């Protein structure tokens, strides 16, 4: 082989080796880039379902040292998994209740444009809590606020704000309603909104901002619902609705709703004689409600809802320290767990309680005759023992010299347990305060705590003489 051939051969071999090295480096670069972008890649949805967004773990015996100078690395943010709520965690063990929120709506109305409201309640989604109320279609310092003591007018709408934000002029009007309930199923809000003629009202079911279903009055006598949050478990929401006499036999039905569509209706069964304005809470796998008997009992009805087979049972809270107003004094009040006590049963007020093993936590007005003051306490054996009256852990929420009103429960899911909270409606204006022509409210909110707590009173606090007439 002559020198020129040697040179050509060596050059060809070198070029081949260089080409192979280049291809290997290109393959390594492509592999590295692909692995980098796939490390935080979201899995492709299967069957239109949202899949978990997890990093891919790559195991290899290669140590890579990367030197970065003035380099910004942006990590892809994957969307959170949206799931239905199931409320399967246990109930938090508490020692009492601690202050959480107060909106001061009436005090602020003395110098600002705040809605006239009543029938407030609170409900939460995964991230925030919201306050709701039924507006009267007017602000307080407005001639339209005259005679707003009336419950049912076509101008009433359901208002919704973040908890602690008073209902100002920019407040969202969710729907037309003079009776309502709202709850979040984990994916979207459901609002049950009732409006129309007393003898032929309509309940609209609004889910994720859209009207999905409706139902008309079935007894032609003021179709009405809870005035507090409904409850959703695994995509099915349930709400208690009543149509019929407020002081006699009425027709109560429990509706089951999936993404705004009514999927089943169950009649009330069990021993409860009259049920309205229920305060419901998740008690996995079912739902439990504490209601108002406006006919026969000052002891509160209990409605147990089976979310799997749609069956219903009902009874009464066993505690002999009864929760409704008006009621007998504590020495003479009674409850046998099964039947209304026939003690000042006519009339009443929305309220709440919840079971804690054999015991019961409850709230009620301090006055046995009027919607004045508010207290909470635990009754030992109050859930299981007829006429139990051993009271512990009493707290004053509103002192007896100040007005209260409706109250209700809402549930908040924590990391390890489900906490129970409650709100108290602080009514002001007519009938008791005849200097003004309007009737409205503010709210105060407390939540269960496992810690210690002090004492106090949290009334509405507005000086009626400072208020617009």
Curated annotation (Swiss-Prot):
Protein name per UniProt: Neuraminidase
Cystines in this chain: 92-417, 124-129, 183-230, 232-237, 278-291, 280-289, 318-337, 421-447
Location(s) in or outside the cell: Virion membrane; Host apical cell membrane
Chain intervals with Low complexity compositional bias: 333-342
UniProt organism field: Influenza A virus (strain A/Northern Territory/60/1968 H3N2)
EC number, as in UniProt: 3.2.1.18
Intravirion face residues: 1-6
Note from the entry: The influenza A genome consist of 8 RNA segments. Genetic variation of hemagglutinin and/or neuraminidase genes results in the emergence of new influenza strains. The mechanism of variation can be the result of point mutations or the result of genetic reassortment between segments of two different strains.
Activity regulation, per record: Inhibited by the neuraminidase inhibitors zanamivir (Relenza) and oseltamivir (Tamiflu). These drugs interfere with the release of progeny virus from infected cells and are effective against all influenza strains. Resistance to neuraminidase inhibitors is quite rare.
